[in-house]
């Protein structure tokens, strides 16, 4: 599945090693406006882990609060904690841009 996200970094980007390959990792908050049953607007935040092939030169610019765009292959896993179901959204980006 291909997914595109626009959102703000929840923390500074970091380099991580996954199965011997280096990636830049970012936690991205994506906000959505929804109407409640009573008609009021509510903002819902989704968190997405974005991985991009190592680009250590960009790390100095990718600080908490910066806005980014990323598009790529999406993996979604579910976990159950204390009876609640949580989604873990991971995006392995082929396209990435600092906004």
Segments (PLM) and residue ranges:
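Single-stranded nucleic acid-binding surfaces, predominantly the OB-fold ssDNA-binding core
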Residues: 1-99
């Amino acid at each position: 599945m291909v997914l595109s996200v626009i959102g703000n970094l929840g923390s500074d980007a970091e380099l991580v090693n996954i199965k011997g390959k280096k990636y830049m990792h970012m936690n991205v908050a994506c906000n959505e406006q929804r109407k409640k049953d009573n008609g009021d607007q509510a903002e819902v935040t989704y968190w997405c882990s974005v991985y991009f092939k190592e680009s250590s030169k960009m790390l100095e610019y990718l600080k908490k609060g910066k806005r980014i765009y990323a598009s790529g292959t999406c993996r979604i896993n579910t976990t159950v904690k204390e009876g609640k179901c949580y989604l873990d959204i991971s995006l392995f980006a082929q396209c990435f841009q600092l906004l």
